[in-house]
Amino acid sequence: MRRTFVPLWLNSASKPHAGTFIVLFAIEAWSRATLITVVPLQALNLLGDAQAVSVVYFSVSIIGLISTMVIPIVVYRIKRRWAFSLGGLLMIAALWAYSAGDPVLFAIGLACQVVATAFLEIVMNLFVLDHVPRSEITKFEPRRLFFVAAPFTFGPWLGVWLAETISPQTTFILVGVFVAALMVFFWFLRLTENPAVTMPLKPPPNPVRFLPRFFIQPRLRLAWVLAAGRSSWWMMFFVYAPLYLSTSGYSPQVTGMIISLSLGSLFMAGVWGSIGRKYGMRFILVSGYALAGGLTIMIAVLQDWPVIAVSLVVASAFAASLVDGAGNIPFLRSVHPYERAEMTSVFVTYRHTAQLATPGIFSVVLGVFALPAVFVVGGTCFLGMAWLSRYLPKKL
């Protein structure tokens, strides 16, 4: 009986469901959130100015974009669980490079982190599509965002506090613990690919072939553009908001606290999700993009009043949380089950495209204008996303 009971208990405990993936996303969020403020401030310290930081982020994002297109082939060759583990190892390598305090190793570490994030995100999204029914996706996304709110609320402050009061290495060690916990929990789950939507015998997806297939579908194309706009805004926020606060005279710990307070807006994801299910996700997206865009532009307009500008930084993040409340629902509700792997690998390029375009554009902008100009560009981009969101289906 005992030999039978233990495997059955393990099978029940590790049976994947929506809550399982929320825990997985939450652990991964701690590993990213703790570095959110630390990494840009370290970049500014090592490189000297915001324009140099933009150039490094732009260069690294090229690597991230290329890796995103190659990852589906890697997943096919070594299977998802090993691809996920490879992402964890790359994250550990990034932490080692960050801890060295060298500009070249910092850039290498940033590249490792970008590629690691791509591996982890693609694999987790594929497992979600396999195991969470399409009818539950609109509930899953707001719940996921609610449970990753705690890491993103406390992580930015925690990372800076540890770096300032103990040592930067302490922050990197803690993130290493989060990554190790993520790997242990993932392997405990013993996740397998759903044979109903996975075809092991087909060749690895060809990026040249499935890129056109993705972008000829209007709903997928719109979902990608909206996600890229959202990611660009957060890329601007995570990198340039700490730089703006630091150059405005705020200490690293205060900067971390302001970013943490701003990201506490993610706790509202469940509320926005409920409103979206009642009035439609299109309403949430149009409202969120428009409100956040206007507030972001006002940061630059009122830059001579630091207290008001800081309040607008926090307010714009809360407005942007409306957009996060919808998450990737426009894509998840549009993709066909039989081409999930191929379309997901293309869709997640929105993150790396945003990471590539944002610092690339801002490196040019900062060559002509002062740092607050990035908020004008970012806010204008969000207003454009609000206009495009009008083309989403009303019943989304």
Per-region residue spans from a language model:
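C-terminal transmembrane helical hairpin of 12-TM major facilitator-type secondary transporters
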Residues: 282-327
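A late C-terminal transmembrane helix in Major Facilitator Superfamily
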Residues: 338-367
